[in-house]
């Protein structure tokens, strides 16, 4: 989700042994550059680029297919949790959710994420939460690694 020009999917496609990667972005310019990036890096047999809104694409076309979903749009990832959950396999998987938060509110954000997921009749466990970068005094970009069961 929020694949952009492919910074995550290209590296994963080149360095891991996954069978298929779906990279979705709503921005047509990013999508064009993603397609070019896939060609340059010779990962077209692994990465399937999709132009569209993840909120619509995942529940309609990628239902229950993913072992792992990366959500690197810290401004809005929280709004897309339901779509991400619909993409995770019934047997479970991992969601990497990026968010901008006040660092001293980390525990309350974790509780909010867990409640949101559990409201969708899924169980979850926060495997880790890491500050990716500081973006202001007491304000940071954090990635939450969430196991969905």
Model-derived regions, located:
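Rossmann-like S-adenosyl-L-methionine
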Residues: 1-149
């Amino acid at each position: 989700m929020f694949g952009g020009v492919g910074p995550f999917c290209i590296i994963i496609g080149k360095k891991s042994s996954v069978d298929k990667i779906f990279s979705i972005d709503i921005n047509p310019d990013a999508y064009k550059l993603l397609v070019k990036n896939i060609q340059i890096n010779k990962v077209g047999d692994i990465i399937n680029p999709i132009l569209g809104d993840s909120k619509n694409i995942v529940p309609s076309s990628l239902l229950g297919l993913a072992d792992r979903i990366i959500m690197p749009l810290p401004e809005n990832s929280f709004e897309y949790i339901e779509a991400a959950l619909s993409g995770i396999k019934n047997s479970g998987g991992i969601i990497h959710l990026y968010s901008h938060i006040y660092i001293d509110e980390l525990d309350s954000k974790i509780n909010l994420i867990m409640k949101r997921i559990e409201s969708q009749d899924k169980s979850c466990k926060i495997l880790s939460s890491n500050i990716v970068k500081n973006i202001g005094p007491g304000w940071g970009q954090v990635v939450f690694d969430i196991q969905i069961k």
